[in-house]
Amino acid sequence: MKTLSGGGYLSRELLKIGVRNIAIYGNTEITKVLVKELNGTDVQILYIVENERVEGIKTIPRSSTKFEDVDLMLVADVSNFKQIEEKLKKFGLKFKIASAYEFLMGLKN
C-alpha cells in the first residue's frame, strides 16, 4: 500500500473530488490508516459502521438501516465489499459507496 503520510495528501485528494465528510464501514487496518491520515484535516470522519466501539469516533452498528448522509462511505471490510455494497444499496442511500482499498490504490502521486 502506498504511504500516504506527509502533508495531508489523502485529504487533498478527497477535497479535489468534493468529499468533506466520510463514513467508514468496518474497523480494519485500512480504517486505522484512514483515521490517522485524516486526523486534523478538513475531511471529517462522521462515523464508523461497526459493532464494537471505536475510540473517539461515533459508531453505528452494522445492523443499522439508517445512516447519516455523507459525501462518501469507504468500505474498509474489503473481503466482504460486494455483499456490504449490495446491502447498503437496498437502503436507497444517496451517497456514494466505494471500496476503501480500491480507492486508496487508485490515488495518484
Can you annotate each of these PLM segments?
Residues 1-109:
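Hydrophobic, well-ordered beta-alpha structural blocks that scaffold small-molecule cofactor pockets
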